Amino acid sequence: MRNLINFAVLIMTIFIVSASGARETRMMEQTCPVFWPMVPCDANKCEQMCRDYYGSVPSYCNRIGTPIAECACSLTPC
């Protein structure tokens, strides 16, 4: 019985820590543009993806014409 209680406390602790880490990551994402890999980068698809994930925010294609092209969603200026 004691092991079961310890196991339950461990699972709850892991859940709480992981939830706070995810919240902190989302807060960090809101400080600069968020980059999504998109090869080739299509401006319309980039704009739609940013709108779907973050609402009405500016978007642009970064590193156009390279194998590491990205769609950037500008949440706030850095």
Swiss-Prot record:
It is found in: Secreted. GO terms for biological process: defense response to fungus; killing of cells of another organism. One of its GO terms (cellular component) is extracellular region. Residues 1-22 form the signal peptide. Keywords: Antimicrobial, Disulfide bond, Fungicide, Plant defense, Secreted, Signal. The keyword Cell cycle does not apply. Disulfide bonds join C32-C78, C41-C61, C46-C71, C50-C73. Belongs to the DEFL family. This is Defensin-like protein 201. It comes from Arabidopsis thaliana.
